[in-house]
């Protein structure tokens, strides 16, 4: 232990401790350190052991403030903040056996092995739980706590321990109830209407219990009996009942009586105490869910409580809650075999009662895969295994198949009164269909082994077969089992979109399923759906499933150019737009793939789509084809691939296209007559403008047909000094060309928008060098004297 404490950081201490746990003698090290703790000065020894007791026996990790306040309780009538020790003191007194987690600000033992050591050496602490319970109750009874008006969302920093105290006092009291604990608990619970601390118990304690807190739902009906019943404090419950002041049938804000809480939590001792009274109604239901004590005990699997309640002659075994569910229904769903067995042994039990959704106990047990419960229920001759529920229309077999409960399916199929082909009325799904969709191989195998199972039944929701569902989700083993059946038709398309299993598999990228289906000569690889008219190759190409595309292209009867009916787009078109480089490469390896096929919607080629999207790798692959048409314009805007790339700002694509001599850099779109240079200047794409202007055959003065504006006009208006400078470096640039819409020159556009430097450059280009600048908004400029030498625009631009 000295070696551990000798390390200077917490990380190194833990590392050293982990090394020690691999060897022997760690218990001796803990014993030695605990002896040192006890050998300290009396008050420090007492505090050190109390710290270890709290940290090792608390129900959850305590925050620093919580632990400090807990150790500051001395049994007086109010909290004295002067008695609260500092965390540094606690750390010192425990001699390094505890640590503070910085991230959560909680106090923990230095290692999990110390927790194990303290658990096995329980004689180190005398009555730890009663001591903790006493501190919790004392804290809650403090005048300072009582006088505080609690809120639902926070605990004030002045009383940080109230949260833990209200949530866990009963847990500790149930384990060890001394006379002192009982006295303090009665003071708290009996004085519910007097003490605000009792309300604190509800407001914060119920939050800890996982119950909803609502400011408008005051716990008026809550009494001390509810608290004692919830925690299972038997001696406190007896003491409260002996006072004869509290109504044992009083309900809390959720409509629970004390018996309900005791049964729900499985506190058989408290249930026994309450059952000895004549004024306890064992069939009372809570107002929130309508469940009786028996129903709650059955749902949570508390066999001891269920047994005691069943011994009462007046208990109603078949009483239903607001959902129409019986105790047997709840026990069956949760797989509580012992409870189910006890209930089925009762003569007046109704084992096949349906709830409001027509689900029986068997249906719930099957849905959860509760094999033993299913077996017990099926042994009852009065249980019908073919009853379908009204919510989803599923039978027990359908539920079991959907969730993959193979053993349950086998048990049900052994029954002569179970129809393996029955489809639910809601969407017409058979058990095989559900098993195939979810990939439950064992269930599918059991069903397919039966000759009376129809593998081609289509559902009413989507019109899909089991093979279609399995193919869509890529369940290869199930697909293989289905294809091994001679009566399975692999080409049955669904009735919704007319999609075949192959199309579903291709769209999902399920290469293994595609391979198995294509091995069948009777599978048509070109069958398209009716909604979009797209083939399996089209879907796979769009999503970039290279392996699927390869398998499809291996078929001799594949049509790689088949366009869809909605947009008239080929697989290459879809792959090019989405940047599926490997798919594009595979398609272009085929000589029968036409790279220039334009779609029917916009008249765009694969190169056009790739250029617009900046798919440079795809563009590169397409340019390797000698038969690609570089200047093909679309029917929507009349734009070529170069125009699309320039308009979208894809510099690298523009550069690749311009390397081809057969690309016309001056071609304009047919809609507004805009060139690539026009788009670059308009949108401020300086790099693209530079690349275009490097072409000797570029026309820098070509204006659009809508406004009659040149690239220089747009650059001057937007204030793009670099583009203006690059344009003015061209000897053939017309700096004084006016547009046709407003009749403004580039100089006028620059002046109107306050671009002073550009205006100066244009004046110099035009030979206009005035002494003073024209009046500009909020700015006055001076210009060189006419006698002063003026730098050429190109030299001036190099400064910028």
Predicted region positions:
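Start-of-repeat signature of ankyrin repeats
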Residues: 221, 255, 289-290, 324, ...
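Ankyrin repeat boundary/linker residues
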Residues: 218, 252, 286-287, 321, ...
């Amino acid at each position: 232990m000295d070696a551990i404490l000798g390390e200077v950081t917490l990380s190194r201490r833990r590392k050293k401790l982990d090394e020690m746990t691999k060897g022997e003698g760690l218990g001796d090290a803990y014993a030695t350190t605990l002896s040192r703790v006890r050998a300290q000065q009396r008050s420090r020894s007492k505090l050190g052991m109390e710290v270890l007791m709290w940290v090792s026996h608390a129900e959850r990790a305590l925050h620093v403030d919580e632990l400090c306040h807990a150790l500051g309780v001395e049994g007086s009538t109010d909290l004295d903040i002067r008695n609260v020790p500092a965390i540094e003191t606690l750390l010192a007194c425990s001699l390094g056996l505890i640590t503070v987690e910085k991230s959560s600000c909680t106090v923990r033992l230095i290692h999990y092995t110390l927790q194990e050591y303290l658990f096995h050496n329980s004689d180190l602490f005398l009555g730890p739980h009663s001591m903790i319970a006493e501190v919790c109750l004392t804290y809650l009874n403090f005048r300072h706590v009582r006088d505080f008006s609690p809120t639902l969302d926070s605990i004030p920093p002045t009383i940080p321990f109230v949260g833990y105290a209200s949530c866990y006092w009963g847990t500790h009291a149930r384990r060890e109830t001394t006379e002192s604990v009982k006295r303090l608990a009665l003071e708290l619970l009996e004085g519910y209407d007097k003490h605000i601390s009792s309300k604190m118990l509800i407001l914060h304690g119920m939050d800890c219990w996982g119950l909803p807190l609502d400011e408008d739902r005051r716990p008026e009906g809550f009494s001390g009996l509810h608290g004692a019943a919830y925690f299972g404090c038997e001696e406190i419950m007896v003491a409260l009942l002996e006072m004869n002041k509290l109504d044992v049938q009083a309900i809390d804000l959720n409509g629970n009586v004390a018996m309900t809480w005791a049964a729900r939590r499985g506190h058989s001792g408290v249930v026994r105490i309450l059952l000895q009274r004549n004024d306890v109604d064992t069939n009372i239901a809570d107002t929130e869910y309508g469940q009786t004590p028996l129903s709650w005990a059955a749902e949570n699997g508390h066999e001891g409580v269920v047994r005691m309640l069943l011994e009462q002659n007046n208990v109603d075994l078949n009483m239903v809650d607001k959902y129409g569910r019986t105790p047997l229904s709840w026990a069956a769903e949760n797989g509580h075999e012992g409870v189910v067995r006890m209930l089925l042994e009762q003569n007046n039990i109704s084992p096949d009662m349906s709830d409001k959704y027509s689900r029986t106990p068997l249906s719930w047990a099957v849905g959860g895969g509760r094999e033993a419960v299913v077996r017990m229920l099926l042994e009852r001759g009065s249980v019908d295994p073919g009853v379908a529920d009204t919510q989803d229309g599923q039978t027990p077999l359908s539920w079991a198949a959907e969730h993959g409960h193979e053993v349950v399916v086998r048990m049900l199929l052994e029954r002569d009164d179970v129809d393996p082909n029955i489809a639910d009325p809601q969407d017409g799904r058979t058990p095989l269909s559900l098993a195939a969709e979810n990939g439950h191989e064992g269930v599918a195998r059991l069903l397919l082994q039966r000759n009376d199972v129809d593998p081609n039944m289509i559902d009413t929701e989507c019109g899909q077969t089991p093979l279609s569902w399995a193919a869509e989700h890529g369940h290869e083993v199930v697909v293989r089992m289905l294809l091994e059946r001679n009566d399975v038709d692999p080409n049955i398309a669904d009735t919704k979109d007319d999609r075949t299993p192959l199309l579903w598999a291709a769209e999902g990228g399920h290469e293994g399923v595609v391979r198995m289906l294509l091995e069948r000569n009777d599978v048509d690889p070109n069958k398209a759906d009716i909604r979009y008219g797209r083939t399996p190759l089209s879907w796979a190409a769009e999503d970039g499933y290279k392996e699927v595309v390869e398998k499809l292209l291996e078929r001799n009867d594949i049509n790689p150019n088949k366009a869809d009916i909605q947009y008239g787009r080929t697989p290459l078109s879809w792959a090019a737009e989405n940047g599926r480089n490997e798919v594009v490469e595979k398609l272009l390896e085929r000589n029968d793939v036409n790279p220039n096929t334009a779609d029917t919607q916009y008249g765009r080629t694969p190169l056009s789509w790739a250029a617009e999207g900046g798919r440079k790798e795809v563009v590169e692959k397409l340019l390797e084809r000698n038969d690609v048409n570089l200047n093909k314009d679309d029917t929507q805007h009349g734009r070529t691939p170069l125009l699309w790339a320039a308009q979208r700002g894809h510099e690298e694509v523009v550069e690749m296209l311009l390397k081809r001599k057969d690309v016309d850099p001056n071609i304009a779109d047919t809609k507004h007559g805009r060139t690539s240079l026009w788009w670059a200047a308009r949108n401020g794409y300086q790099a693209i403008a530079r690349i275009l202007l490097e072409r000797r055959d570029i026309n820098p003065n070509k204006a659009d047909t809508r406004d009659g504006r040149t690239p220089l006009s747009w650059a001057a208006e937007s204030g793009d000094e670099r583009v203006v400078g690059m344009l003015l470096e061209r000897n053939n640039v017309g700096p004084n060309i006016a547009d046709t819409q407003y009749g403004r020159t580039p100089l006028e556009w620059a002046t109107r928008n306050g671009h002073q430097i550009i205006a100066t450059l244009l004046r110099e280009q035009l030979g206009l060098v005035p002494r003073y600048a024209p009046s500009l908004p909020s700015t006055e400029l001076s210009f060189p004297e006419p006698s002063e030498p003026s730098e050429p625009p190109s030299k001036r631009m190099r400064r910028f």
